[in-house]
């Protein structure tokens, strides 16, 4: 039995999210196990079909739906669809295979312990019925048996599984599903680790690209191939390589909220913020239709439904659409938990609870910030720290140094809480890292307020370095790029050339965002480069065309 580093070293995002919202109706299968009740057949699941999966039309429809839902990162609902396929055709070996596959690990989550026994039972049934399956499903069942050599969730041999799938992709060179499943397994082995910091591909990335490219050539509308291609290239130096797949996903599976959302990952990297916002609005609507049909809770709701609101905020903020952005932050928490109470000890729920504070800071709503109720003491150290940060920023930006200093002292005390080092936001970055940026930013605001502009620049340079050192997440967990503040501080210091470099750096991170375009215009103008400044002003006007707030500085 092989217990790989894949299983041992990471307890990734979705397992941490599944228990974040509590309540009596959450009793039952935890994490990503099958949802309760009979599986519905949803509208809008696209045209993906698997003719050799099952003998009955109903089972084939459930099977195809399960595959699409799994590729749309809703494994609990996918498992329920495979159970529907089994109910319609109990002797369907492929349907049992699908259930075992859906309960396994993904690029976002290791296998949940509670899913191990159901997966083992489904795989056992698939193996018992394999003689009735098509040749390729017999091969897939045998490959999945390599992945799950024992019943434990930590007994995953992903490397052995990938080796079998690589061989099957070669054996079936005209089979898009085989290529996607092989690529998926290799992605699982190296989650989000496909590009080096300098933009060069990792040693395994070329094979992932080749497998997915083959699948897309064979089946341009394959939901899994398009989804994984976007994830692969959103982190690359050339995110535009996934623009065709992003466009396809806008309409490919209108019933999958997550697949509708996926184009936004490329839109944000390529400066198409209006399209990113629209993609998330469509995904929110699709998930609302889905949630009206099923009582989905746990990982999908917390990890993906709320994520759409978070992403909408990020896109709308880059457009200057304050009303849409602020409303999106206020909707994230309810989207995560619905009517269930949330556990503020969960880093992801504290993250969603903090979003409205960040939004009010981003848009300079100082008086609204000062009326925000202090969070209760207890297990929400991150939320409390960011409340102090937001209030301190409001005091500093309204010219109240004594109050701002008191808030900074409270923030520094809150930052010393040991809990912050172990509280992970979306199981990616420690809350302490973000609180550190908050301390540096508030120190800079206070220094600028009392005329110590050079000191303010120094604090903000440290904040930029701290932000750059964070692990990647999209949207970025620090919700107002620190380069906006640094560039503004450099302009205040008369250091226009340095400000220009900072704003150009930010525009490489967030192309055509109005905040940095405005800052760049000011920096060029102060250097006497009026022709260039006018060209950038035209770009700013295009970027800010849908804004509902005026902008005279690169930050409020």
Please report, for each region that a protein language model flagged, where it lies by residue.
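N-terminal export signals
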Residues: 2-8, 12-28
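TPR/TPR-like (Sel1-like) alpha-helical repeat modules
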Residues: 100, 104, 115-128, 268, ...
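TPR repeat positional signature
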Residues: 62, 96, 103, 139, ...
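Residue-level recognition of tetratricopeptide repeat
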Residues: 58, 91-92, 175, 222-223, ...
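Residue at a conserved register position within TPR or TPR-like alpha-solenoid repeats
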Residues: 69, 103, 146, 186, ...
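Solenoid-like repeat scaffolds
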Residues: 87, 169-171, 218, 248-255, ...
